[in-house]
């Protein structure tokens, strides 16, 4: 009974309406937070997952040891790797393809890699006109790694305490 009386008083006084109207007015006069892209950009987290890249060691040798863990863990089956042994007994990839159309950008490939060879870099602007351009081969992935290496290394360093 008491609950119904309280509800009737609130309804008659329009307290819910007044509260909602006050909140709307607060946001109406608050400073705008619109970012005019591409002239302005929001800060990006070091853990941001963008365009894929294959990294190299400072000596120029590619990091990938062809363990195929990234291919095995990929839930979308977007990664295809072929490898062959080298003269020194180590393995290196002869083919490393990522179908970016299938990729769900989950980051599992990056987490599985024991040598930090495959990473998801900071690049967000890789739109294309055709689907075929989204099939990345080894050369394109290595070019991405070379282009973004400084920023990728910095982001991995910032993320190191959480790994």
From Swiss-Prot:
Cofactor note: Binds 2 [4Fe-4S] clusters per subunit.
Compartments reported by the entry: Cell inner membrane
EC number: 7.1.1.-
Topology term for the membrane: Peripheral membrane protein
Keywords recorded for this protein, A-Z: 4Fe-4S, Cell inner membrane, Cell membrane, Iron, Iron-sulfur, Membrane, Metal-binding, NAD, Quinone, Repeat, Translocase, Ubiquinone
Reactions mediated catalytically: a quinone + NADH + 5 H(+)(in) = a quinol + NAD(+) + 4 H(+)(out)
Top-rank EC class of the record's enzyme: translocase
Main location per the UniProt record: membrane
Listed GO biological process terms: aerobic respiration
Gene3D superfamilies reported in the protein's UniProt record: 3.30.70.3270
Binding site for [4Fe-4S] cluster 2: 74, 103, 106, 109
Binding site for [4Fe-4S] cluster 1: 64, 67, 70, 113
CC terms in the record's Gene Ontology section: plasma membrane
Pfam families, A to Z: Fer4_7
Cofactors: [4Fe-4S] cluster
All residue ranges annotated as the 4Fe-4S ferredoxin-type domain in the record: 55-84, 94-123
Keyword Cell wall biogenesis/degradation belongs to the record: no
Annotated InterPro entries: 4Fe4S_Fe-S-bd, 4Fe4S_Fe_S_CS, NADH_quinone_OxRdtase_chainI
Keyword Plastid: no
Gene Ontology molecular function: 4 iron, 4 sulfur cluster binding; iron ion binding; NADH:ubiquinone reductase (non-electrogenic) activity; quinone binding
Protein family per UniProt: Belongs to the complex I 23 kDa subunit family.
Function noted in UniProt: NDH-1 shuttles electrons from NADH, via FMN and iron-sulfur (Fe-S) centers, to quinones in the respiratory chain. The immediate electron acceptor for the enzyme in this species is believed to be ubiquinone. Couples the redox reaction to proton translocation (for every two electrons transferred, four hydrogen ions are translocated across the cytoplasmic membrane), and thus conserves the redox energy in a proton gradient.
Quaternary organization: NDH-1 is composed of 14 different subunits. Subunits NuoA, H, J, K, L, M, N constitute the membrane sector of the complex.
NCBIfam families noted in UniProt: NuoI, PRK05888.1-4, PRK05888.1-5
Name of the featured protein: NADH-quinone oxidoreductase subunit I
């Amino acid at each position: 009974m008491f609950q119904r009386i309280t509800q009737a008083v609130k309804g008659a006084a329009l307290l819910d309406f007044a509260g909602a109207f006050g909140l709307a007015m607060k946001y109406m006069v608050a400073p705008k937070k619109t970012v005019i892209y591409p002239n302005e950009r929001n800060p990006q987290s070091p853990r941001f997952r963008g365009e894929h890249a294959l990294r190299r060691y400072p000596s120029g040798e590619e990091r990938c040891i062809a363990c195929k863990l990234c291919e095995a863990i990929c839930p979308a089956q977007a990664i295809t790797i072929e490898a062959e042994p080298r003269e020194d007994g180590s393995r290196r990839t002869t083919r490393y393809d990522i179908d970016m159309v299938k990729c769900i950008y989950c980051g599992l490939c990056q987490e599985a890699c024991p040598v930090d060879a495959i990473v998801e870099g900071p690049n967000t602007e890789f739109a294309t006109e055709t689907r075929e351009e989204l099939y990345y081969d080894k050369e394109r992935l290595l070019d991405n790694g070379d282009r973004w290496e400084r920023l990728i290394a910095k982001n991995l360093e910032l993320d190191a305490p959480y790994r």
